[in-house]
């Protein structure tokens, strides 16, 4: 790190300023300022969201003096993975960072009506949750660019005096013209009553905006709305991010997203030090304390090695992202699922199918749209692979290529047998794909898909489903949830009244929130105080020791010995603050479990690999042996890549056997239920 005198009065904006004051400060700045995504999107894009607050908080003292516009440290998938894997509460993270970097605006990423989940929530849930979260900058996007869906979030955020950052989801397509984007910006400006209290973000989540295109778009927006402050969020996947950032800045963008150079891999964002140098060499001043930025980059190097295991197996930049458009934030989780499902070798075919699919069903591949795309397209490829092997995978990619690229999606121009095959293409698509077609997320950017897509997804009921399709925003079509009933249900489940923050976690992710609460009741603040290597692997050898502080007191734990297993019990000897203690640890012996597969007409199998997160449905609750179910009724739900996949009764029947339990991991085709016709 170079020795350099620290800049004085480098803080441009800070918590407590009004939105008008923040916008005015950025607007009057000569050059650009920066948002660091090092505490959130860097981890989501290249490290499976596994970066722990234990390590990230070490950057806070540098951020506090760096002169950042904001630090994106909250929201997106970090919220969910936090409670599910890292066992950290997003509320804890805010509290820790508020204390350590009081000069920095804390920024979240929120998915309009989907909040920090993957489905639309009712208006009263949105208003309740948004009013309780202590965040300064609310970046809000819609994967459909349906600005109507932002209304509830915008109203609460602006009423609270926090900065609302409405966001355009950006892609490159024949329909994604300047005229289209200007119409979205107009809707945003109308929603927010002008440009004085907002900052507009352009979210290039896949990194597909070429140098000319992004500069042209920002120039068009600035010509129409010269006072509008613009921020550019741009992933590096295509390898052309830095010149695109420069093009955006030259066209009038005021803020750019960056991350520590030492965090940069393949799917995240551009390196902060390199961007600062590149911009200033190009004549654009950058508001940044370079000394503190260098220190932050170096601090990351001290702990990033603990996360090598979380990096994507798909190495290198990928300019073909301009075709398949998988967003940077979805790469690691998609590859993780492909590895676990043993279909990583099919990734080239899946990405090819995605590039064709996104011309048939047009929306933006960003959460939850990216999960819908991934589960749908990977499901198609895996089904053909299972039924026909590699030849089947080649066949389905060629079929789609012929339909999209050669026949220009003229269904009638395809051969009869090809038409029949297309009409089965989406028959096993996930429930969220079907919800998308039914308008349950909002309206698609440039209209609904062709009728054959509905025939393919819904079979004989396609015409009925089109008539049921919603044109309203979920804010207007969903009824309110009974919050007190939900709170009471959580209290009954955990055996006490939930804290306010626990209830909000539950509203977002009921199953995972309950598991989080149980875990933290058992293990306390261990996720916050244990070093990352110990958190992940524990103390492995006699003599291994960990030192930490808890509530201001020092603790030391040393592993002395691990005894032999006897009847499923192992005695572990530890020294805790030099006092020897013996712990009896249950270690159930692994039992070989036979996986039963569905083979008969009255046996219902899993349509995909996933986790059983509901048995029954919200309307009737859990179902059990002996219950009567009706044709078309949901009898269970599997989760895969954060998407719901409803299991539907094929006919009126009685449940003869329930073959799985909640939270079981199941394989495609595995037996879920045995039913008998009634």
Predicted regions and their residues:
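Active-site-proximal beta-alpha loop/turn segments in soluble metabolic enzymes
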Residues: 40-46, 79, 166-176, 198-210, ...
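Terminal or standalone catalytic/regulatory effector modules within metabolic enzymes
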Residues: 36-44, 58, 62-82, 313-321, ...
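Catalytic alpha/beta core domains of metabolic enzymes, predominantly
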Residues: 205-398, 415
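Structural recognition of alpha->loop->beta junctions
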Residues: 61-68, 124-138, 182-202, 247-256
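Active-site beta->alpha loop and helix N-cap motifs at the rims of alpha/beta catalytic domains
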Residues: 75-186, 206-209
